[in-house]
């Protein structure tokens, strides 16, 4: 994920990558102290949503105090982090845009609290997620939210990490510029609109 943060920074964004596993690892360690992904997932599961949102809010607040900050902030995440991006769009005042890569949309009560544009990506070879992202579109429209999404054919979960499977590399080449353009649209200029679209 550090490589992704670096790619965002190269686009001119201030990027903070909070370690939501800080203090949860062996001997109080962080993300890097977990040897196995399953152990990391279990540890993260012990942290409540309010705790995670608090860590994300603290990272955002820190970023906004940096000299180059323009007063706007966005959030992106991948898998569980993609779900946190959805949650943050609802729970953190002052977030201006959210991009979710293969993250689960929230429940309707949380969705109703979303105040910012959301962009979501998924692959149709991710049967536990793709239908949920597609189902979020009419709900977001009904709620008057600005929502864009793209579900890629023959693409798996975590497609940015698994480039050799199916059409994952194609999805990566398409989704990344879309995410950058989305952030530039909502973080660099005053924009007020409500729409739901896929293309």
Q: Where are the regions a protein language model picked out?
A:
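Serine-hydrolase catalytic machinery in alpha/beta-hydrolase-like enzymes
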Residues: 1-65, 161
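Acidic catalytic loop of the alpha/beta-hydrolase fold
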Residues: 125-130, 157
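Short beta-strand/loop motif that positions the catalytic acidic residue
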Residues: 114, 120-122
């Amino acid at each position: 994920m550090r490589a992704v943060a670096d790619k965002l920074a190269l686009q001119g964004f201030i990027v903070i990558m909070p370690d939501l596993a800080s203090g949860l690892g062996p001997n109080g360690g962080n993300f890097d102290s977990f040897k196995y992904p399953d152990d990391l997932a279990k540890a993260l599961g012990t942290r409540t949503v309010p705790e995670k949102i608090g860590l994300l809010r603290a990272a955002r607040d820190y970023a906004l105090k940096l000299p180059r900050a323009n007063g706007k902030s966005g959030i992106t995440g991948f898998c569980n982090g993609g779900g946190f991006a959805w949650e943050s769009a609802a729970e953190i005042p002052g977030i201006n845009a959210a991009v979710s890569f293969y993250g689960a949309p929230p429940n309707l009560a949380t969705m109703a609290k979303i105040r910012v544009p959301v962009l979501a990506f998924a692959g149709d070879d991710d049967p536990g997620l793709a239908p949920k992202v597609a189902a979020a579109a009419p709900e977001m429209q009904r709620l008057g939210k600005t929502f864009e999404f793209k579900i890629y054919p023959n693409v798996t979960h975590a497609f940015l990490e698994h480039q050799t499977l199916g059409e994952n590399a194609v999805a990566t080449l398409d989704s990344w510029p879309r995410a950058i353009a989305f952030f530039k649209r909502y973080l660099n200029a005053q924009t007020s609109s409500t729409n739901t679209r896929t293309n």
